[in-house]
Amino acid sequence: DDLASNQLPAFVHEFHLRHPGVRLEIRVEQQLALLEWYDERVIDMAILPLEQPLILSSDIELWQDELIWVKSRERNYALTEPVPLVTFSPKCTYRDAAIECLEVHDIDYYISMESPSLAGVRGIVSSGMGVTLINRGLMTSDQCEWPEAKKFGKARDVKFVVRATSMIPQKLRNLVISELESLLPGKAR
């Protein structure tokens, strides 16, 4: 979903212009669903953000981003009141990271909204309905970092990786990686 919201349309457009003979079948889903599909060989390649413990030595890192706590610029949330958490659905590792962080720091919270999509999470946070944990690069202009989250220390980093089966020829894998990196100036390895 991270890629689909920002880089995917440009990637698909450029890829098809440069490689009209290559047919792509693209599915967009949250990390844990993609990993399940990959393990079941429903898909041969996954491009997804993962935290270090989930990264395999065979994964190819595209770029790294930090997770940050984000809120609407219009609203403030004190840690003395139950924190409204806007989160992704259970197939997203960011949800687990957010809940774990709040529970480790003994912060009272409730899930004010759950969405399977980045657009849903960002929209609800922008409306002032709560805070969320997302990649720094996905924060919108009407959002800002949640200052109270400094109490939690530095949030985790995520790495956007390519995971591909041996069914994907090395030449095609390299082609996809090269095309993705060309769209990410300053973020690529």
Where are these regions (language model features)?
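Flexible hinge/capping segments at coil-to-helix
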Residues: 54-90
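A late-sequence structural motif
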Residues: 7, 151-189
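Central regulatory/effector-binding core of bacterial HTH transcription factors
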Residues: 1-54
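Beta-alpha-beta core module
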Residues: 55-60, 65, 126-168
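Short beta-strand and adjacent tight-turn residues that come in two discontinuous sequence segments
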Residues: 29, 43, 47-49, 114-116, ...
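Secondary-structure junction motif
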Residues: 84-105, 172
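Short beta-strand-to-loop elements that line the ligand-binding cleft
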Residues: 23-29, 108-117
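Hydrophobic residues within well-ordered alpha-helices
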Residues: 38-39, 98, 123-128
